[in-house]
């Protein structure tokens, strides 16, 4: 089964809740999953030839939460090319804002630029439609976990 690093960007805890639920689901499927709540580049490096799941909200004018900015900047400034990385993204946002789910979209764009391979589609969760994000993320994670080798 797969080894998965779950990297969290959160402001109010919803992304962490989604990540912890994902960890439980993936572990139940036989995968080895680990959540990184305040992730740094050193946490990311062991997963470059494995799987990562980025779970992040969006804050301000479409920005990443402070907790995941150091990781994002570290990847952008230090890594460059990650063709062996396979990843998924769960993005939380509110569609009443112009930059809906932009935190997750930024992460996806960065990893695409670095030739990482996204597994499945990115999940966009709208807080204005679904105040309990795990009800939308849990089925997605169950499906995503079946795509990993």
Swiss-Prot record:
InterPro entries: Flavdoxin-like, Flavodoxin/NO_synth, Flavoprotein-like_sf. Pfam families: Flavodoxin_1. Monomer. Binds 1 FMN non-covalently. Gene3D superfamilies: 3.40.50.360. Belongs to the flavodoxin family. MioC subfamily. The gene is yqcA. NCBIfam families: PRK08105.1 (NF005989). Probable electron transporter. FMN binds at residues 10-15, 99-101. GO terms for molecular function: FMN binding. This is Flavodoxin YqcA. PROSITE patterns: FLAVODOXIN_LIKE. Keywords: Electron transport, Flavoprotein, FMN, Nucleotide-binding, Transport. The keyword Disulfide bond does not apply. The structure is significantly stabilized upon cofactor binding. The keyword Flavoprotein applies. Its cofactor is FMN. Residues 4-145 form the Flavodoxin-like domain.
């Amino acid at each position: 089964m797969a080894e998965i690093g779950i990297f969290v960007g959160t402001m109010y805890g919803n992304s962490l809740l989604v990540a912890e639920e994902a960890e439980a689901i993936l572990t139940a499927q036989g995968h080895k999953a680990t959540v990184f709540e305040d992730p740094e580049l050193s946490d990311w490096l062991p997963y470059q030839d494995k799987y990562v799941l980025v779970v992040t909200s969006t804050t301000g004018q479409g920005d990443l939460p402070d907790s995941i900015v150091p990781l994002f900047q570290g990847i952008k400034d230090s890594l460059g090319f990650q063709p062996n990385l396979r990843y998924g993204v769960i993005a939380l946002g509110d569609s009443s804002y112009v930059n809906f789910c932009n935190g997750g979209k930024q992460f996806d764009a960065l990893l695409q630029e670095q030739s990482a391979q996204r597994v499945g589609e990115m999940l966009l969760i709208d807080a204005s439609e679904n105040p309990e994000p795990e009800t939308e993320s849990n089925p997605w994670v169950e499906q995503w976990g079946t795509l990993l080798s």
